[in-house]
């Protein structure tokens, strides 16, 4: 007689995470974490497949998907891509059904960000793989070649640059703006840094040009205006003494611009036209004058110095007199000493310029201006994350009051001229 008793169906054993004792004892903690993590990932993927397809060996006519073996995939781990076995699921009509965990872990953004961060701290594309923590031997890793790292850096920074150069700046209440240029290969990158009412610094824009000329600077300022920068109220501009930059600011802001010439650049220009034996005494005299909060007294000291140099060193005397009043602008505004020191020079933006120079010196082959712009913007954005408030920021309300008074004088000018 035929036995019609059905055999009990096999039940799927729920996945469990376990390691043998020798593995725990012999592996270091770093390798152990990776090993356990990869096992947990495989079990999580299999659990998600079971939720979609139902338990193994149990027939369910109403199930929405079925198992379809596995294939070799890749995920991001520790700054590189690693090969991982990916379970596959198919719908009744043959379409691939994605597993949520795999979709989330297969994002490329973490890898792009890691490559960008490594390069911005000075790791070259050739040494990128050596900068990463080693993985256990049983994990197959790839994607750390210099060309792969370079492609990720370009991809990540290109998206950041496009967003950075188009973002609105009208919602940043500014009291001062600094402009300076840095040479990157055959290109000049003009950088604008603004200081808001709380003393925080903001990289507002970057412009690429062949030289630090008025046209390039004007285009940068016009771009900032189109992105929301107000040109209808007075603003303090701290410049290095470049006539091209000053002309461009005057073209865009007109009389609303108050100019502060950098005293460090002024001192450097004067000393370059003097013999070395005079550097110490002239530097001391200029520093003593600029350390005063009395603009009239400082101007008198500097004019006396120019007269003493006029006979033997007329070039140095002329350099000292040129734009002298604009090196004392912040002194005349009656600001506190700490804020005067912060705004009397372009040191605040020079630190950023130095970061750009340091990183650009590592690049051996500059392909074009777009590459130079991308590197400059990436460096500027990275440096901006570490910006601190300027010293003397509590005195900014006094600066804003002085700027408002300047606006009021400009508004009364037509009335005085008519009278």
Stretches found by the model and what they are:
Residues 110-122:
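Short, amphipathic alpha-helical "recognition" segments used to contact nucleic acids or chromatin
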Residues 1-24, 28, 42, 46-50, ...:
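Acidic/histidine-rich catalytic cores and adjacent linkers
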Residues 45, 115, 128, 149, ...:
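Short, conserved catalytic/metal-binding motifs centered on acidic residues
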Residues 2-4, 58, 65-68, 74-93, ...:
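RNase H-like nuclease fold core
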Residues 267-294:
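Conserved phosphate-handling catalytic cores of large alpha/beta enzymes
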Residues 48, 131, 152:
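Residues in the recognition helix of alpha-helical DNA-binding motifs
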Residues 255-272:
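Inter-helix linker motif
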Residues 122-133:
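Short, charged amphipathic recognition helices of the HTH superfamily
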